[in-house]
Curated annotation (Swiss-Prot):
It comes from the Eukaryota. This is Elongation factor 2. PANTHER family: EUKARYOTIC TRANSLATION ELONGATION FACTOR 2, TRANSLATION ELONGATION FACTOR-RELATED. It comes from Komagataella pastoris (Yeast). It is found in: Cytoplasm.
Length: 842
């Protein structure tokens, strides 16, 4: 137990080589918060008695009631290492004290945006995997997010006590199950190898995998056992570590190591991992759980475990917990793994700088980030807002990448749309206070140097969700975070009492600040819309809105799904529209964009800010575009980043460059609200075939061109066999075999399609993966539990957009009904207008 003072923390912060910023990530219910507890307890914040039950990082009331983590919370830990351990660290360090900033993040799919925010400010990740369930869909999603941010993973295989007590497996089975889990983690990592970081895969024999039980508070790495045996037998620890995993066997008769599983006489030998690592653990479990009073003291003496008087009287699980905690304390194994194998900010920022910084990679700011220099110009990235205890205000939560933040310092607050040299999205204000985040409390601190995580008071009014703080006007922003989920479910919110309206508006502002992935806006019909990533996410957001942010009773509409509008063919004829004054004409055709390219644009692989020649090259090589077309992309839409394109295919048009901005603006308007549902368009490419313009500049201004472009886009769109795309969830369901029938019947009823069904080796569980339209997903969990007597647990994550069958213009079809309902809800005319409305004859 360590008692911190802020001054001690501050002196540690200056030795940046000894700081570790890491997040804990995992699938829901694999035990992140419980594991985090055993770490926090070591740093002296909760007492030993409560660990495993306190879930210290679940700070909110609803988190404690539901037993899930919703927001990510930060905590600082302190750790000291022995001299011979410090020697093994492959990066520069000073002294033996380490400061670990740990962020516990949620595992539930709906909150993966919280995880993204946590990952941006950390350099390493502790990936927790349940040893019975293995690598699940969310483990993969989060791991991918981490690797995309160039974050180094280490793995903990948790809930080993379940395997021992519930499934009663043999040692070899357990070893095989560990090996399989490690392999499936490495498969995900291998698909994301990055040459700058080197090999990121995890290996038990190198000490980058720990095994343990968060609930019982014990864990071990192969390295710890190697240390024990190397002292006992006097062999080299590094050699011992390699022997304790994989196919190496020890023959006790000849005292020799072999890699064959039989000795000379053909008798089977026991694997070294089973013999030296698992055997003592299995023996302890067997002796204690079978109440063998005479064996226990002998074992404890051999393992050098000393119990206090009152602890000797315990039995069963209680005794097991105490003994295992003394034998293999979880914090030791995890802290050792974190300190030895995760990078310090100095190491990590050297290779993360170019993925973090938007500007040129050779300017002084990027160099400051790369060197993590506390004396360079200030660069702070704010990744999210954390509500303070008095509800009204927020702490800005983020990380100093270069320079030093001081209380009272004047900073430039740059929002995500800021461009150097312009005044948009920029405020210059003083930082009121800087604080350290410690789970449920905050500690004031004078200044924070580069490489550390902090909270800032007094700038919350100027930032929406995330942004960059700098002191120099030449500095570019840090890159915006890419969220792996998109808000696809929305509800309309009204107040029950009209006088409360201003409070609702204020509450919505606060809500969109506090959650990185919620959208709030006012629709055309004047409703207040809140959009979230799924049912649970929305439920939590609305609860927050009602209780904290607005504090007034609300009326909430049933949830509605957002759609996308697209085309399935090329326009059947060239669309033409004339401007209001009849002097300008635009000729267009629309055609669909391949799904591959749309995804690449949405994931940011093809980016509007890329160099156009480089982008043309990629589009020609990978997506089969014509190079001349690819070079003449005028813009992406909507919002300048969506998956719709304008391509200029016109030849020798006079004054064309003058109306380019107006055409782009018209296209942004058209793609933001399509003609069918008023939703965003997706995967629509518009080719400008010809433009006729008036000779006088005054007759071809924005007021003439913008509405014309919007109309002609609609006309071309409606001529190209329009279709509606709906969002699809990927559902992963874990269940025993007898529940599979129930799952299929519920999925069939909900238009779901099963894509795979497999049994997890060594367990009675099956994993069913299926696609389920978001529209049908409301109440899915409840129905599924009814059909399977509560044995099936679904996990849903947004996967892709899929075209709906049927003609959206025909009110009799299923799609037509959706269109009709949506148009009624938004107060439009009931029938979709024909193309004639937007098409002008010559």
């Amino acid at each position: 137990m360590v008692n911190f003072t802020v001054d001690q923390m501050r002196s540690l912060m200056d030795k940046v080589t000894n700081v570790r910023n890491m997040s804990v990530i995992a699938h829901v219910d694999h035990g992140k918060s419980t594991l985090t507890d055993s770490l926090v307890q070591r740093a002296g914040i909760i007492s030993a008695a409560k660990a495993g039950e306190a879930r210290f990082t679940d700070t909110r009331k609803d988190e404690q009631e539901r037993g899930i983590t919703i927001k990510s919370t930060a905590i600082s830990l302190y750790s000291e290492m022995g001299d011979d351990d410090v020697k093994e660290i492959k990066q520069k360090t000073e002294g033996n004290s380490f400061l670990i900033n740990l962020i516990d993040s949620p595992g539930h799919v709906d909150f993966s945006s919280e995880v993204t925010a946590a990952l941006r400010v950390t350099d390493g990740a502790l990936v927790v995997v349940d040893c019975v369930e293995g690598v699940c869909v969310q483990t993969e999603t989060v791991l991918r997010q981490a690797l995309g941010e160039r974050i180094k993973p280490v793995v903990v295989i948790n809930k080993v006590d379940r395997a021992l007590l519930e499934l009663q497996v043999t040692k070899e089975d357990l070893y095989q199950s560990f090996a399989r889990t490690v392999e499936s983690v490495n498969v995900v990592i291998a698909t994301y190898t990055d040459k700058t970081i080197g090999d990121n895969q995890v290996y038990p024999e190198q000490g980058t995998v720990a095994f343990g039980s968060g609930l019982h508070g014990w864990a071990f790495t192969v390295r710890q056992f190697a240390t024990r045996y190397s002292k006992k037998f006097g062999v080299d620890r590094i050699k011992m570590m390699e022997r304790l995993w994989g196919d190496s066997y020890f023959n006790p008769k000849t005292k020799k190591w072999t890699n064959k599983d039989k000795d000379a006489a053909g008798k089977p030998l026991e694997r070294a991992f089973n013999m030296f690592v698992l055997d003592p653990i299995f023996r302890l479990f067997a002796a204690i759980m079978n109440f063998k009073k005479d064996e226990i003291p002998v074992l404890l003496e051999k393992l050098e475990i000393n119990l206090k008087r009152e602890e000797k009287e315990l039995e069963g699980k209680a005794l097991l917990k105490v003994v295992m905690r003394k034998f293999l304390p979880a914090a030791d194994a995890l802290l050792e793994m974190i300190v030895l194998h995760l990078p310090s900010p100095v190491t990590a920022q050297a290779y993360r700088a170019e993925t973090l910084y938007e500007g040129p990679s050779d300017d002084q700011f990027c160099i400051g980030i790369r060197e993590c220099d506390p004396k360079a110009e200030l660069m702070v990235y704010i990744s999210k807002m954390v509500p303070t205890s008095d509800k009204g205000r927020f702490y800005a939560f983020g990380r100093v990448f270069s320079g030093t933040v001081k209380s009272g310092q004047k900073v430039r607050i740059q929002g995500p749309n800021y461009v150097p040299g312009k005044k948009e999205d920029l405020f210059i204000k003083a930082v009121q206070r800087t604080v350290l985040m410690m789970g449920r409390t905050v500690e004031p601190i004078d200044d924070v140097p580069a490489g550390n995580i902090l909270g800032i008071v007094g700038i919350d009014q100027f930032l929406l969700k995330s942004g960059t703080l700098t002191t120099n006007e030449a500095a570019h922003n840090m890159k915006v975070m890419k969220f792996s989920v998109s808000p696809v479910v929305q509800v309309a919110v009204e107040v029950k009492n009209a006088n409360d309206l201003p409070k609702l508006v204020e509450g919505l502002k606060r809500l969109s600040k506090s959650d990185p992935c919620v959208l709030t806006y006012i629709s055309e019909s004047g409703e207040h819309i809140v959009a979230g990533t799924g049912e649970l996410h929305l439920e939590i957001c609305l609860q927050d809105l009602q209780d904290d942010h607005a504090g007034v009773p609300l009326k909430i509409s049933p949830p509605v799904v957002t759609y996308r509008e697209t085309v399935t063919n090329e326009s059947s004829m060239t669309a033409l529209s004339k401007s209001q004054n009849k002097h300008n004409r635009i000729y267009l055709k629309a055609q669909p964009i391949d799904e591959e390219l749309s995804l690449a644009i949405e994931e940011g692989k093809v980016h509007p800010r890329d160099d156009f020649k480089a982008r043309a090259r990629i589009m020609a090589d990978e997506y089969g575009w014509d190079v001349t077309d690819a070079r003449k992309i005028w813009c992406f839409g909507p919002d300048g980043t969506g998956a719709n394109l304008v391509v200029d295919q016109s030849k020798a048009v006079q004054y064309l460059h003058e109306i380019k901005d107006s055409v782009v603006a018209g296209f942004q308007l058209a793609t933001k609200e399509g003609p069918i549902l008023g939703e965003n368009m997706r995967s629509v490419r518009v080719n400008i075939l010809d433009v006729t313009l008036h000779a006088d500049a005054i007759h071809r201004g924005g007021g003439q061109v913008i509405p014309t472009m919007k109309r002609v886009t609609y006309a071309a769109f409606l001529l190209a066999e329009p279709a509606i795309q709906e969002p699809i969830f990927l559902v992963e369901i874990q269940c025993p075999e007898n529940a599979i029938g129930g799952i299929y019947s519920v999925l069939n009823k909900k238009r779901g399609q099963v894509i795979s069904e497999e049994q997890r080796p060594g367990t009675p569980l099956f994993t069913v993966k299926a696609y389920l339209p978001v529209n049908e997903s409301f109440g899915f969990t409840g129905e599924l539990r009814q059909a399977t007597a509560g044995q099936a647990f679904p996990q849903m994550v947004f996967d892709h957009w899929a075209n709906m069958n049927g003609n959206p213009l025909d009110p009799a079809s299923k799609v037509g009904e959706i269109v009709l309902a949506a148009r009624k809800r938004q107060g439009m005319k009931e029938n979709v207008p024909g193309y004639e409305e937007y098409y002008d004859k010559l």
